[in-house]
Amino acid sequence: MFLGSYLVFTLIYNLYLEFFRSPVYYPDYFTHLVAKQSEALISSFDYNAQILPHQSELSMKLIVNDVYLARIVEGCNAISIIILFASFVLSFFGKLKLTLLYLLAGAVIIYAMNIIRIAILAIGIYEYPGYTDFLHSIIFPLIIYGTVFILWLIWVRIYSQKHSV
């Protein structure tokens, strides 16, 4: 069930991304939305954040206090992570209502954590530029994959309690 749902969701997502391919460089809707929400969160911490479309790729430039810090690309929008999460949950399908509610709640949590991690990364890079690689390579993935792992553990626990004799 995992592989099948993962392949179907990934195919649908890739078809969605194909819809946004054009000669004009501008990211897909979700990537743009994540960039806008990250900008708002960073700004709420009294930083002057702004996003601008990248001139030569499908991404948004993230600028904090007039310093270009990062690109927000399609891989930053958490959709691929949500697909991975959903595929795992569906491979342990429980009662329909419970499974769908958990999928929705998990997707919202992952999406929100993704916005938070982008804000942490941007502020961290701005304040501690010498730690850019560490923040992006270790802390950044740890936040999102740690969240997914915890959600998976919770789901397996719920599922196993519902199916124990």
State each model region's role.
Residues M1-V165:
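Hydrophobic N-terminal alpha-helices or hydrophobic patches in metabolic proteins across all domains
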